[in-house]
Amino acid sequence: MALPDFTMRQLLEAGVHFGHQTHRWNPKMKPYIFGDRNNVHIIDLAQTVPMLSRALQVVSDTVASGGRVLFVGTKRQASEIIADAAKRSAQYYVNARWLGGMMTNWKTISNSIQRLRKLDEILASEASGFTKKERLNLEREREKLNRALGGIRDMGGTPDLMFIIDTNKESIAIEEAKRLGIPVVAVIDSNCDPDQIDYPIPGNDDASRAVALYCDLIARAAIDGIARQQGASGRDLGASEEVPVEPALEEASEA
């Protein structure tokens, strides 16, 4: 395995270079702006390329050392893409709504995850002795918890790295990451504050094709990290008769 390749052409075709209207910009983004066209800022892809490459390396290194990556994107055009990318790369995600304290109050979140697991057990049992109405209420509670916490139910603790689409919308997630010292990889559009981000990627954070490209590359970088971690163990885990227990799952079961 190797880090995923990408080209300037791919970035252009996905519309990564299109920022927002010039009057909506954040002046801190000036170093990453190439110019403007029809009152829309054009992001300097000559800077995006190396910064995206650096972000991919960080993701791969984090996973290779046994770390967990949390994908965060709750806006409509990112929600499904974020979840798919995280699942494909055996990572974790928040794609519905960021609950305040999701990282900084992990104990409370863990209790809610335990409740979600309990509801799964209860509803899987046919002989649970509930009325139709009681069962319906339990199903609704499970659905609500699963929508909020389904993507982190097996995370087993706070992540080692966060990848974020739309830093303005996910400002609370970024604040919590900062408080806990969790590094953040994020796409920064022309209306964002780059100072808040450890590994910024200048680019459009609204176009579905651009979001899909970032998520695909980050997911593939995480998969590269998994391959490196397995290679470092000196054996082919896929060929083993006994597959080792994933530490994150082990921690989650103990939580």
From Swiss-Prot:
Family note: Belongs to the universal ribosomal protein uS2 family.
Classification via PANTHER family: 30S RIBOSOMAL PROTEIN S2 PROKARYOTIC AND ORGANELLAR, SMALL RIBOSOMAL SUBUNIT PROTEIN US2M
Region (Disordered): 232-255
Coiled coil: none
Protein name: Small ribosomal subunit protein uS2
Source species, domain of life: Bacteria
InterPro entries: Ribosomal_uS2, Ribosomal_uS2_bac/mit/plastid, Ribosomal_uS2_CS, Ribosomal_uS2_flav_dom_sf
Gene Ontology molecular functions: structural constituent of ribosome
GO biological process: translation
CDD domains: RPS2
Matches recorded under Gene3D superfamilies: Glucose-6-phosphate isomerase like protein, domain 1 (3.40.50.10490), Helix hairpin bin (1.10.287.610)
Organism in which the protein naturally occurs: Sinorhizobium medicae (strain WSM419) (Ensifer medicae)
Keywords linked to the UniProt accession: Ribonucleoprotein, Ribosomal protein
One term under GO cellular component: cytosolic small ribosomal subunit
